[in-house]
Swiss-Prot record:
PANTHER family: TRANSCRIPTIONAL REPRESSOR NRDR. It holds the Pfam family Zn_ribbon_NrdR. It comes from the Bacteria. It comes from Streptomyces clavuligerus. Residues 161-172 have a biased composition (Low complexity). GO terms for biological process: negative regulation of DNA-templated transcription. The lineage of its organism: Bacteria, Bacillati, Actinomycetota, Actinomycetes, Kitasatosporales. This is Transcriptional repressor NrdR. Belongs to the NrdR family. Negatively regulates transcription of bacterial ribonucleotide reductase nrd genes and operons by binding to NrdR-boxes. Keywords: ATP-binding, DNA-binding, Metal-binding, Nucleotide-binding, Repressor, Transcription, Transcription regulation, Zinc, Zinc-finger. Residues 46-136 form the ATP-cone domain.
Amino acid sequence: MHCPFCRHPDSRVVDSRTTDDGTSIRRRRQCPDCSRRFTTVETASLMVIKRSGVTEPFSRTKVISGVRKACQGRPVTEDALAQLGQRVEEAVRATGSAELTTHDVGLAILGPLQELDLVAYLRFASVYRAFDSLEDFEAAIAELREHRLPAERSGGGTCGTGTVPVPAGTAD
């Protein structure tokens, strides 16, 4: 690492720590030539490959913005959206891959969003999975019901939004 003061081509690492959010490493360095100290912050780049083939850096803000649209009119706080964004970023970084597709990012969003709000999950999934018929929605709702019923019997549940109501005329 070049010294920013004297441009010496080398430096010694004095201290290394992870940042509070755990996504970067902060290094305190010292120049062997001028003995001045400076700090560097190192972050592994995470790139997203879009459908068009264009590659761009992963953006937690973009994830939150997309999920916010699905949560419009729902009782979801900004804090909950920020936590979801962090969980998604942690999940995609945990893959160890430097490049991900938008499909991979979408998959990483679905799980935490389903725990956060079922209606927002269904809205997001309808766009992400390109629902084009009523049957697609019905299949997704049936899948949600199947997933929730065993959890409710055991006293658990995946989110605090209550049970998925059964439409009139379909009850046993």
